[in-house]
Amino acid sequence: SNKKDYRKEIVDKHNALSRSVKPTASNM
């Protein structure tokens, strides 16, 4: 359960970064 929360946090941060840089987000 701890790992899931940790992973979700990373995904949230990654999503936030992707939102900041839309051009690079499409490459991923």
From Swiss-Prot:
UniProt KW keywords: Calcium channel impairing toxin, Disulfide bond, Ion channel impairing toxin, Neurotoxin, Secreted, Toxin
Segments passing through the bilayer: none
Region (Disordered): 1-28
Subcellular location: Secreted
Record's keyword annotation contains Transmembrane: no
Composition bias, Basic and acidic residues: 1-15
GO cellular component terms given for this protein: extracellular region
Main location: secreted
Gene Ontology MF terms: calcium channel regulator activity; toxin activity
The UniProt record lists the keyword Calcium: no
Tissue specificity remark: Expressed by the venom gland.
Record note on modification: Contains 8 disulfide bonds.
Polar residues composition-biased segments: 17-28
Protein family per UniProt: Belongs to the CRISP family.
Function: Blocks contraction of smooth muscle elicited by high potassium-induced depolarization, but does not block caffeine-stimulated contraction. May target voltage-gated calcium channels on smooth muscle.
UniProt-recorded name of the protein: Cysteine-rich venom protein asurin-2
Species of origin: Austrelaps superbus
